[in-house]
Amino acid sequence: MRADMTLPWWAWAMMAAGLAVFIAMLAISIRRHGGIRRPLFASPYALWMILFTVLPVILIGYYAFTDASGAFTLDNFRSFWDSNFESNKVILDAMGEAGAAYVSRGTVNVDTLGYSLWMAFECTLICLALGYPAALFMADREMKLGPTLVVLFIIPMWMNFLLRTIAWMSLLEDSGLINMLLKALGFQGVQLMYNSGAVLLGMVYNFLPFMVFPIYTVLSKMDFRLSEAAADLGCNSLQTLYKVTVPLSLPGVISGITMVFMPSVTTFFIPRVLGGGNTMMFGDLIESKFLTEGNWNVGSALSLIMMLLILVSLSILRKADPNGEGGGIA
């Protein structure tokens, strides 16, 4: 844990300014609505956002651009592409031969980010390939199975995310259910754990509902008379799907892609449990900087880089779905 938690005067001033802005906004809202009742209901949310979103971002920004003594520096960002930088030695030493390979290429953080982006891309693509047909089936009014399937998708989400991930170990490990069945059928056991495939499986399992529900929300609100009109004009089912249904459901698709891609890039528990430490994603890297090394400065710099990626993803969502019709988990 970081020993020096002393903040400069300007950091305290920025936090005080944020609190002052909150009080001013509350006062203006009370004056505008002619009473305190409505603004009072909104004030807990505004205060929560300031305390747990705005102020943490200010602190991360402070640590990202300072060293341990509080002096301004850009070395924290330099460590992102320089594996020989001092702050990377702890992780590289723990990785052994793999760490030595990163040193020879000088790209431990860049490679980790690239691997995370690739895994997130694969996860998003698989979730889209599985989620769109599922959402289409759920929204089919003739089948009348939509509410039942929604419940079936929601029930696993009632269980803790960590427990759902750990549960896969009992299926994939060498003495797990799958290998037991293979051996009972006369086949040799296979290595299903501690590789990228297991990590990808865990990611798809956990994030698939975040792809299904936005698409289902949009499809369930779609006027299906448009599909009937397309059929009357001579379109077959496949043509109706690509010319009518898919274009109208794009807001949900974009929303689902964003909701799956962002947590996929930042996840760190799934690679640790199902990857067994053989795979490292960007979330693992940030977590190790904060908790293992206690290096809040470099960890904050890496967090800012991740925030930038998230902002880019959100901007793409905003551009593709300007009216916010993508839906969500309702």
Placement of each model-derived feature along the sequence:
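C-terminal transmembrane helix and the adjacent membrane-cytosol boundary/short C-terminal tail
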Residues: 20-36, 216-231, 297-330
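Transmembrane-helix boundary motif in ABC transporter permease subunits
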Residues: 20-34, 121-154, 227, 319
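N-terminal signal-anchor/first transmembrane alpha helix
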Residues: 2-62, 137, 147-151
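Interhelical loop and adjacent transmembrane-helix boundary motif
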Residues: 2-10, 71-88, 268, 272-322
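Short membrane-interfacial helix/loop motifs at transmembrane-helix boundaries
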Residues: 47-109, 171-175, 276, 328-330
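Transmembrane alpha-helix signature in integral membrane proteins
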Residues: 9-19, 93-138, 204
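Transmembrane alpha-helices
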Residues: 44-53, 151, 155, 205, ...
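Membrane-interfacial helix termini and adjacent extracytoplasmic/periplasmic loops
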Residues: 3-7, 31, 74, 93, ...
